[in-house]
Amino acid sequence: MMGGGQQQLQQLSQELQALDEEIEALEVEIDDHREEQSDIDDAIEAIETLDSGSTVQVPLGGGAYVRAEVQDIDEIIVSLGGNYSAEQSEEDAIDVLGRKRDALDDRIEETQEEVDELESESQELEQQAQQMQQQMQQQQMQQMQQSQGDEE
């Protein structure tokens, strides 16, 4: 019976490890969404404070930037997703970005709920594993006591 208990305990341990990995991946996803939200907030702030004639740094990639003068703030090019972009007025651009931020809020909330469920499941499995270990220890103690009693 002890062999079967060890096997069940090992299976629980593997399930716990898989749950922990899944939780970690979801938490990374949440962090990515929060970073994306921060980028959106920065973009909205830049749109609201930018004026024609302002000098900005334009990223070229690889950590390289070039300074450029903003010539026209009337139309802002906004990514719509799926490699599509569109020119938008300042107000419309802020609206599009706000909706993206709201969608990220929803995704974060859904993902956090999933994390919470998995953490709850993980706690239940940990409790089961602890109970199994205690039972196995008690059985070992009883067997030791019996064998000592048999020797006397």
Curated annotation (Swiss-Prot):
GO BP term (any one): protein folding
Keyword Chaperone applies: yes
Single GO MF annotation: unfolded protein binding
Subunit structure: Heterohexamer of two alpha and four beta subunits.
UniProt similarity note: Belongs to the prefoldin alpha subunit family.
Described purpose of this protein according to its UniProt entry: Molecular chaperone capable of stabilizing a range of proteins. Seems to fulfill an ATP-independent, HSP70-like function in archaeal de novo protein folding.
Designated name of the protein: Prefoldin subunit alpha
